[in-house]
């Protein structure tokens, strides 16, 4: 019977670990976000910041697997050196 218990144990461990992290983030991030909102009172400034943020987030996409495998293969060849 240990197999059905494993997901439940993992879930409870994760919730116990993540809850304090979420509280800590909320305590520190909310005042910063409120201060930022006060500074960004103009609509143009908010839109400019949002567009920059969306651009940065769109650039952090993981490479597709085909591209990564080609890079791994070439790096492996460089590490191994010339074949005899």
Swiss-Prot record:
Main location: membrane
Listed result of changing residue 52 to A: Abolishes the ability to mediate myoblast fusion; does not affect interaction with MYMK; does not affect localization to the cell membrane
Ranges where the record places region Disordered: 60-84
Short motif (AxLyCxL): ranges: 48-57
Pfam family of the protein (one): MINION
Gene Ontology CC annotations of this record: endoplasmic reticulum membrane; Golgi membrane; plasma membrane
Cross-referenced CDD domains: Minion
Biased amino acid composition, Basic and acidic residues: 67-84
Compartments (UniProt record): Cell membrane
Gene inactivation effect: Perinatal death due to a reduction in fused muscle fibers. Embryos are motionless and lack skeletal muscle: they are nearly transparent so that internal organs and bones are apparent. Myocytes differentiate and harbor organized sarcomeres but are fusion-incompetent. Myoblast fusion is impaired downstream of membrane lipid mixing step mediated by Mymk and defects caused by the absence of Mymx are due to impaired fusion pore formation.
UniProt-recorded name of the protein: Protein myomixer
Gene: Mymx
